[in-house]
Amino acid sequence: MSVRVAAGPRLHFGFLNLSLARQRLYGSLGVALDEPQVAVSAERAESVVCSHDRAREHVERACHLLDVPGAAVTVESELPAHVGLGSGTQLALAVLAAVARVHGREPGVRAHAPSLGRGGRSGVGVAAFEAGGFVFDAGHPASQFTPERPERGEWTVPPVAARHEIPGDWRFLLVLPDAEPGKAGSEEDDSMRAVVENADPGLADRISSVVTDRVLPAVATGDVDTFGAGVAEVGRLNGAWYAGEQGGVYRPPAGDLVDVLEDTPAVTGAGQSSWGPAVYGVTDRERADAARDAGRRALAEAGVDGEVRVAEPRNVGARIRDD
């Protein structure tokens, strides 16, 4: 039996709080998108067979976690790495789900994600893989965390505090400039440590107000204009925390791209996803073509090459199919 697992990217709009002076640390917001996609296929095997270096590590860990002898895994397509779309989490969980399925095991995605090194700070990627939609996670008790990243497996994925179906006519502009990749690994850990050690708790209060007064009501009622403006403001306020680590409220060249998109009537809000360089714009089906044109214009005015696409929301989890 062969199994195929396909998952899409997620946008990460920012955190609710990065200060240890508040009761909860982190708490992230994001949405699941339908494209681009990562897809892996797997068959039973008595050992690990995988030519993709990163995926092979996940296959080995998955086999250990599930107590199975092996699997032959092929990566059919993958998300661009370290651009702010959550590629690492989606690949790791897709591999886990595929290996589990061919052996007739439950994947235990949420339980096993920490052992795969995923879901430590943000729970959006794991929740997006599970069920799609708009996700707001509860973060962690600040008393249990320090600025240091916990060892692999020594955490639980933040629980989902709120999830909503994203209206089917909403669209998300993706602008992926040809730029240096976003922070990851030890570099990301070092930057997050510096940010948490110095985070102004007052920003968390302002972000909380935006989330509760604008973002959550907007996604619940289908108000795309208020939602776009709200998540963009969450991103700007998060950028004040990160400015010293990424060279400004947005990392270059994301700021130039956001400026153009924010001046476009077809885009209700724009920002940087995670560490970038991916930039998003919130729009809808009717304005999608104009938003796409604005994305191309933004790249041209910034003097950089890149890719522009408009993605639909994904309100379901990863697709698992027996071939």
What is the role of each PLM region?
Residues 85-110, 126-141:
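DPxDG-like acidic metal-binding loop motif
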Residues 6-8, 32, 127-130, 174-178, ...:
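Short beta-strand segments
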Residues 248-250, 254, 272-281:
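Small/polar glycine-rich anion-binding or flexible loop at a beta-alpha turn
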Residues 1-83, 101-107, 314-323:
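ATP-binding N-lobe of GHMP and related small-molecule kinases
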Residues 42-44, 177, 281-285:
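Short beta-strand-to-loop capping motifs
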Residues 4, 39, 134-136, 172-174, ...:
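Conserved hydrophobic/aromatic beta-strand scaffold that supports enzyme active sites
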Residues 21-24, 114-265, 286-323:
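ATP-dependent small-molecule kinase catalytic core of the GHMP/sugar-kinase superfamily
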Residues 269-273, 310:
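Short beta-strand
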